[in-house]
Amino acid sequence: MQKFEFFEHTADIGIRAYGRNLNEAFENAAVAVFEVMTDTSKVEPKEMREVKIDGYDLENLLYRWIESLLVYYDSEIMLFSKFYVNIDEKNLTLEGKAWGEKFDPNKHERRTVVKAMTYHEMKIENKGNYYILTFVVDI
């Protein structure tokens, strides 16, 4: 199963992330967002950051997960390439970890900066044996 794909969207970037379960789909969504910004295969998992959030529904958890990671990028210039997510669907909480390193222009390709997560076209689909997360990021 592919981890993610991009789709055309006027002035922004659409992402479809896939996973065998909801946690994996959220992890792959994060990889996709950082792949927009750089080649994540060149981002070493040297430092770890934690994210603990709650939401009012799964879409809000997805929004807040990506938003939290972008805050680390904006405040520390952190790029991430490895993620761990544990979602409690009953209580709508997410505990996640992201591993990466600070942006180094000599090592990391500078692609398009993701400015923000959006709710535009957001959809979380449970297909029985896999999940599809669809969303758009502002660039």
Curated annotation (Swiss-Prot):
InterPro entries: Archease, Archease_arc, Archease_dom, Archease_dom_sf. Gene3D superfamilies: Archease domain. GO terms for molecular function: calcium ion binding. Disulfide bonds: none annotated. Keywords: Calcium, Metal-binding, tRNA processing. Ca(2+) binds at residues 12, 138-139. The keyword Magnesium does not apply. Signal peptide: none annotated. SUPFAM superfamilies: MTH1598-like. GO terms for biological process: tRNA splicing, via endonucleolytic cleavage and ligation. It comes from the Archaea. Transmembrane segments: none annotated. Belongs to the archease family. Activates the tRNA-splicing ligase complex by facilitating the enzymatic turnover of catalytic subunit RtcB. Acts by promoting the guanylylation of RtcB, a key intermediate step in tRNA ligation. Can also alter the NTP specificity of RtcB such that ATP, dGTP or ITP is used efficiently. PANTHER family: ARCHEASE (PTHR12682), PROTEIN ARCHEASE (PTHR12682:SF11). This is Protein archease. It comes from Sulfurisphaera tokodaii (strain DSM 16993 / JCM 10545 / NBRC 100140 / 7).
